[in-house]
């Protein structure tokens, strides 16, 4: 988080610790098939990219090129959106946008101690449950392993943080969660359940679109840094940093539960719930926008 203010130097190698512990835990539990190797190779590319950025400066263009290579590795290994009503020439570009978006979304919300890691843990928990419900044990184990690594990291990342994940960690967990969310089976009961991954990862997705919208209104570049994140606005309103972070955890948990619930509904019921959630998101964005960040 470039928007963080520190009174003391804090190490940025937490992301590398998450990556290594994730690899070790999987090596002890699973045998590696093509899809898993693709996910791990893509994650490794992202980690190298993040380390370079944490210890130097990468232009947005170079960073996007590196992320694109990682996404192409995933698609080549068979990790992409697979829905019967979407042809491959739509699925591949959509998968690319999804993975690039989620990878950067977790980097975008990393503006407070424990925020990105804790939200990512909640997302991992939801994906784990989806994997168990669908008897997809590889997905469940990978999500559980990632969640365990994040929980261990949170002990040292919660306010006041002793270590940060940096771009290395935020982009890595974004790539992992984007991949794992994409390969789950959500549409057993209704086609509208394909929205479940968006709900599971709803907090970083909401913040990304919210920040881009505010910057657009101000005539700024959407990739410019600015203190317009939902978490910073909540803190500006009246919450403390810890209260804001814990509230974000709660919202992420509720969205994960909503995703699991929507998977069990009939089609019409799912449509109604989605409309309600979209309305709540729009109203929340409107209220957050009204908070004056200039004072």
Where are these regions (language model features)?
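Membrane-interface capping segments at transmembrane-helix boundaries
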Residues: 158, 283-295
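Small-residue-enriched core segments of transmembrane alpha-helices in multipass membrane transport
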Residues: 170-171, 201, 273-280
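Hydrophobic alpha-helical segments of multi-pass membrane transport proteins
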Residues: 207, 280-285
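Extracellular/periplasmic helix-loop-helix junctions in multi-pass membrane proteins
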Residues: 257-275
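Alpha-helical transmembrane segments of integral membrane proteins
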Residues: 228, 235-254, 258-263
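Cytosolic, membrane-interface loops and tails of multi-pass inner-membrane proteins
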Residues: 1-11, 210-242
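Extended hydrophobic-aromatic, low-complexity segments
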Residues: 189-192, 212, 223-225, 243-244, ...
């Amino acid at each position: 988080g470039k928007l963080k203010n520190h009174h003391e130097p804090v190490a940025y190698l937490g992301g590398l610790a998450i990556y290594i512990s994730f690899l070790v835990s999987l090596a002890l539990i699973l045998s590696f098939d093509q899809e898993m190797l693709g996910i791990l190779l893509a994650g490794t590319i992202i980690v190298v990219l993040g380390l370079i950025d944490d210890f130097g400066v990468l232009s947005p263009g170079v960073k996007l090129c590196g992320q694109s290579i990682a996404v192409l590795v995933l698609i080549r290994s068979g990790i992409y959106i697979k829905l019967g009503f979407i042809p491959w020439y739509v699925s591949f570009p959509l998968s690319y946008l999804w993975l690039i978006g989620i990878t950067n979304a977790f980097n975008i919300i990393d503006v407070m101690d424990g925020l990105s890691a804790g939200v990512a843990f909640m997302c991992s928990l939801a994906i784990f449950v989806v994997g168990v419900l669908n008897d997809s044990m590889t997905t469940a184990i990978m999500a559980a392993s990632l969640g365990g690594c994040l929980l261990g990291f949170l002990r040292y990342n919660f306010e006041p943080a002793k270590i940060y994940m940096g771009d290395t960690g935020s982009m890595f967990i974004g790539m992992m969660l984007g991949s794992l969310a994409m390969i789950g089976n959500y549409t057993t009961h209704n086609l509208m359940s394909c929205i479940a991954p968006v709900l599971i990862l709803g907090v970083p997705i909401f913040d990304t679109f919210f920040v881009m919208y505010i910057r657009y209104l101000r005539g700024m570049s959407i990739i410019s840094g600015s203190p317009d994140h939902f978490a910073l606005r909540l803190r500006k309103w009246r919450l403390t940093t810890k209260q804001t972070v814990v509230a974000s955890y709660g919202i992420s948990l509720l969205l994960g539960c909503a995703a699991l619930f929507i998977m069990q509904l009939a089609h019409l019921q799912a449509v109604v719930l989605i409309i309600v959630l979209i309305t709540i998101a729009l109203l929340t964005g409107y209220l957050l926008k009204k908070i004056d960040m200039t004072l």
